[in-house]
Amino acid sequence: QIQSISFPETLKILAERAGIPLPNNNSRQSTDPKQKERDALRKLNEAATRYFQSLLKNPEGGLSARNYLASRNFEAETLEKYRIGWATPTWKGLLTHVKKKSSVTQQQLIQSGLIIKKEDSSAVYDRFRGRIIFPIMDLYSNIIGFGGRSINQEDQPKYLNSPETLLYQKSETLFGMDQAKQAIRKENQVVLVEGYFDQMRAVQHGIENVVATCGTALTTKQASMLRNHAETAILIFDSDTAGRSAAKKGFDILMEHAMNVKIVV
């Protein structure tokens, strides 16, 4: 319930951890339309991630994005670890690619949040264009959504996220939690930062028990997840007005969850 996954999904995860094979039950699966929708969205997100990664590695098409990431001092190994990608500034690049490569429907693409349908017409276009792409993962490294960051000041907003879907609930997700959870348990401490780059940079420098709120105020569900992994939280947010406000709110919520809380100023 805390991790917002169904009973069959929980059973599958626990069986995989214990190395116990589960019997196939195709009739049960076929009667669970929501589960089938979630599975389809996961496959679609995986296909999109591979596409975005290929664009970043493209010798010419991904050059501007690679130069930008190099200017932020990110190593190739870090980019690969997080499966960072690039969405070119075209209106239908992903849409065209996915429809060629799979039997996915336009409605599934809309439900995933990867494409947008114009309100006044039937026209559709890619949500992410001209942006660095951050795949957002659940606790088990399933890709549930995406964040995109523009590399040019004139392209606003600076950050753009997937809308909420069957897989992605923003208030229940922390960027990097899938990779950080073991280190958080080991240290019995979690470091909270604001953005994707903040979290990635910390890990690149050897600090592994770090997660990011991605510019939003910490929620009760996120705090509950953290409390299940550690007793102490350290908040390192920006020193601007918004950052100080987010730190104060996060402090209060974490204290309500009986955590030891420190704020770095």
Residue ranges and their predicted role:
Residues 1-112, 116, 131, 162:
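Non-catalytic accessory segments of DNA primases and related replication-initiation nucleases
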Residues 62, 159-183:
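Juxtadomain coupling helices with adjacent low-complexity linkers
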Residues 2-5, 17-21, 72, 101, ...:
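Conserved, well-folded catalytic cores of nucleic-acid-processing
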Residues 78, 143-145, 152-169, 188-191, ...:
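TOPRIM fold recognition
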Residues 100-129, 178-189:
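Short, basic/aromatic recognition patches
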Residues 4-11, 38-45, 174, 220-223, ...:
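Amphipathic alpha-helical transducer elements in NTP-driven molecular machines
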Residues 131-137:
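A short, hydrophobic, proline-anchored segment that marks a local hinge/packing element in signaling
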